[in-house]
Amino acid sequence: MKITWFGHAAFRLDFADKAVLIDPFFTGNPSFNSTVEEAARGVTHILLTHGHSDHVGDTVSLVEDAADASRTLPVVANPEICAYLAAKGAGNAGQMMNTGGSLDCGGFTVTMVRADHSSGGPGSPSEYLGNPTGLIIRAPGEPTVWHMGDTDIYSDMALMCEIHRPKVVFIPIGDRFTMGPAVAALAVKRFLPGVEVVVPCHYGSFPILVQDASFFAQALADHPVKVVVPGPGGSFDANITPA
């Protein structure tokens, strides 16, 4: 599996014949240093953790571009976000699911799990877009990935690890809207047994967020987990033991 981070909480997973975008916030993302065309080339699915504009991002335009090319680009999201996207012109691209549920996407499975945050559209708080979530992505022969979404620490992260056995975790560290570096590091140490790789995210993109991952990485220097900080636009291969 090849993993690319585009800054903020936007990731791309490439494996087998799939190219999966998670929270594709490109336009307006100060950390984004590529082009939308390049970042989305060959994309087969979009997954959304919640409805804030810095996570829904370019979803509608990407779905419209796919439709113009006579193909459907599935968007996995909660029912409220799917209804919102349909109203914005995304048609029937939405693939509805909700917390605790799993969805077979044909070649991989997505499970929605808890995140402690909020969720609303660009007009929020007037637009309620369901509960925020994290996403567990499983594919045959690949390490299980957990994108935590935007969240604070919670003790049942340990239960999520017991149930889903993720090997790679994307964890927010930016503070103010999510947990900060110290709390995120504590979450890794206390509640993420068996995780082999953690990738910090949701930082450095806006001035009000923590600007770098150095404290987070230093706090985990003596912990048996690999901290990968790819930098915006950077990629790495997750060649680790599949779950």
From Swiss-Prot:
<dbReference type="InterPro" id="IPR050114">
    <property type="entry name" value="UPF0173_UPF0282_UlaG_hydrolase"/>
</dbReference>
<dbReference type="InterPro" id="IPR022877">
    <property type="entry name" value="UPF0173"/>
</dbReference>
<dbReference type="Pfam" id="PF12706">
    <property type="entry name" value="Lactamase_B_2"/>
</dbReference>
<dbReference type="InterPro" id="IPR036866">
    <property type="entry name" value="RibonucZ/Hydroxyglut_hydro"/>
</dbReference>
<dbReference type="GO" id="GO:0016787">
    <property type="term" value="F:hydrolase activity"/>
</dbReference>
<comment type="similarity">
    <text>Belongs to the UPF0173 family.</text>
</comment>
<dbReference type="InterPro" id="IPR001279">
    <property type="entry name" value="Metallo-B-lactamas"/>
</dbReference>
<protein>
    <recommendedName>
        <fullName>UPF0173 metal-dependent hydrolase Xaut_3786</fullName>
    </recommendedName>
</protein>
<keyword id="KW-0378">Hydrolase</keyword>
